[in-house]
Amino acid sequence: SYVFVDEDEEEEKKVSLEQVALKSTFFNNIELQVVKQHSSPLSPPPFMVGMAEVEVDTETGEVDVLDYVAVVDCGTPINPNLARVQTEGGIAQGIGMALFEDVQYTDKGKIRNNSFMQYKIPTRMDIGKIRVDFESSYEESGPFGAKSIGELVIDTPCPVLAEAIYNATGVRFRELPITPEKIAMGILKKKGTDENS
């Protein structure tokens, strides 16, 4: 397979997918990013609801996730134990995305914080208690009644934690990560606005 520079499909303006993969992976320190996606109409979406109990220090902006509860409808899980572990791992990643992970780029498009010394991810101590349950359903078009589960479990914690932090502080956050600095500044700004009202 080839990628063409323009629609003329001239031989001198094409490059193989193998060359694209090699150059982007081994000879360049810029990561590949997905810019297009496709979803099949025969693949019904899974659903998930999440709830979080958080504790927010209104002086420092520190957030402790005390308890996270998730209920997932992924059809009939083929392997319930693996589905549970995948859900717990996805929730942990989602908590990291919501509260810690801040990808920063240089002016040349390279990732600035490209090591775990600079890029904070949550530890088990940062995550709190995670409880997972599954809604019993059967998907006719899925294998053995199952639906997908992968991306759903990573996406749900961000809005759940943003709402929990809003309930604790009265401050809305619409950009991730919701860091202690952003929370503390948001609380100070809200106090100033409330005092001027």
Language-model regions: role of each:
Residues 1-197:
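Cofactor-binding beta-sheet edge motifs in enzyme active sites
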